[in-house]
From Swiss-Prot:
InterPro entries: COMT-like (IPR016461), O_MeTrfase_dom (IPR001077), Plant_O-MeTrfase_dimerisation (IPR012967), SAM-dependent_MTases_sf (IPR029063), WH-like_DNA-bd_sf (IPR036388), WH_DNA-bd_sf (IPR036390). Optimum temperature is 40 degrees Celsius with N-deacetylisoipecoside as substrate. This is Cephaeline 6'-O-methyltransferase IpeOMT1. One of its GO terms (cellular component) is cytosol. It comes from Carapichea ipecacuanha (Ipecac). The keyword DNA repair does not apply. It catalyses: cephaeline + S-adenosyl-L-methionine = emetine + S-adenosyl-L-homocysteine + H(+); deacetylisoipecoside + S-adenosyl-L-methionine = 6-O-methyldeacetylisoipecoside + S-adenosyl-L-homocysteine + H(+); 7-O-methyldeacetylisoipecoside + S-adenosyl-L-methionine = 6,7-O,O-dimethyldeacetylisoipecoside + S-adenosyl-L-homocysteine + H(+); norcoclaurine + S-adenosyl-L-methionine = coclaurine + S-adenosyl-L-homocysteine + H(+).
């Protein structure tokens, strides 16, 4: 067996470089969060053209004594691809434009949520959790479950809902164009756990004859207003799901254990069981290994799987695991419509 001592200097340097990139990768994300909080992307856009360092620092709400440090922050973010630098001026890249407040597909909330203190702390409790009896590392770090914590912390709840909305904007664009046939012939649809209704609003706007309902916990829908063919109802998917031609579950089941998933799915099946033919449940979630078979080598779903472990002690599932859940919940058949990005669309028949 080869030892470290027997490795060549070049091999050791490559290993050190690899570890350095991994260890320091968090700095790129922390710097990006800082840039958002300081308003750097929007400052550059509002300027209307690339900004030099003096113009940029003058536009930011910072202590003047810290202005000389901005160029070091920008250097890191340029290397990470969020900004471009030419002739001592900074401009937005296509990636950086996704950080603008007014971009309809912006991912600002996703960035801010992933580096929220309350969501980072459980990662540092991971090794302790492996040794104790807590349900999830989040509980080890905070003394309560994620859902109990967010119910008492409106700020974190808003950040979390905003992150889910970012994801929903991207998915909605695909659903109402490439996958619009999923909604053809339907008269009613319930988006279970749909939060502020980002996804349901897009569907309702695209299909004006489809009655769309968002069903979520009271605190999630308390301040939401329905409009036209969209409304909001307070409810608990573990107790009952409102009746409809179709039930939509987007990024819901990966938050829960197999046992809880079966409970949710059974309630969804009851909600469509009284309908004429065409009743179905639409699940949008990850399917481990399927993306790789489709040529997507992005390790993002592996990262998401660990995120589910840390927050909820839940997981991303492979097709065999999904099939068992659907069968245990009483569904007669399912089909995977298509994969896109990390996500798969699955149609369940009662």
């Amino acid at each position: 067996m080869e030892t470290v001592e027997s490795s060549s200097s070049a091999e050791l340097l490559r290993a050190q470089t690899h570890f350095s990139r991994q260890v320091f990768s968090f700095q790129n994300f922390a710097a990006l969060k800082c840039a958002l909080q300081l308003g750097i992307p929007d400052a550059i856009k509002q300027h209307g053209k690339p900004m030099n360092l003096s113009e940029l620092t003058s536009a930011l709400p910072i202590n003047p004594s810290k202005a000389p440090c901005i160029h070091r922050l920008m250097r890191l973010l340029v290397n990470a691809g969020y900004f471009a630098q030419e002739n001592e001026c900074f401009a937005l890249t296509s990636l950086g434009r996704l950080l603008l407040k007014d971009d309809p597909l912006h991912i600002r909330a996703l960035v801010l949520s992933e580096f929220h203190t309350a969501l980072v702390m459980p990662w540092f409790a991971l090794s302790e959790w492996f040794k104790n009896d807590d349900v999830a590392p989040f509980a080890t770090a905070h003394g309560k479950s994620f859902w109990d914590y967010t119910s008492c912390d409106p700020e974190l709840r808003n950040v979390f809902d905003g992150a889910m909305a970012c994801d929903s904007h991207l998915i909605a664009k695909a659903l109402v164009t490439e996958f619009k046939y999923l909604f053809e012939g339907l008269k009613s649809l319930v988006d279970v756990g749909g939060g502020n209704g980002t996804l349901a609003r897009s569907i309702a706007k695209a299909f004006t004859n489809l009655k769309c309902t968002v069903c979520d916990l009271p605190e999630a829908v308390a301040n939401e207003q329905g409009d036209g063919n969209l409304d909001f109802v307070a409810g608990d998917m573990f107790d009952r799901v409102p009746s409809a031609d179709a039930i939509l579950l987007k990024s819901i089941l990966h938050d829960w254990s197999d046992e809880n998933c079966v409970k949710i799915l059974k309630n969804c099946k009851r909600a469509i069981s009284g309908k004429d033919k065409g009743g179905k449940v639409i699940v949008i979630d990850g399917v481990v290994e399927l993306q790789k078979k489709a040529g997507n080598d992005d390790p993002g779903l592996d990262n998401m799987d660990m995120q589910m472990l840390v927050l909820f002690n839940s997981k991303e599932r492979n097709e065999k695991e999904w099939a068992k859940l659907f069968s245990d919940a009483g569904f007669s058949d399912y089909g995977i419509v298509r994969t896109f990005g990390w996500w798969c669309i699955m149609e369940l028949s009662p």
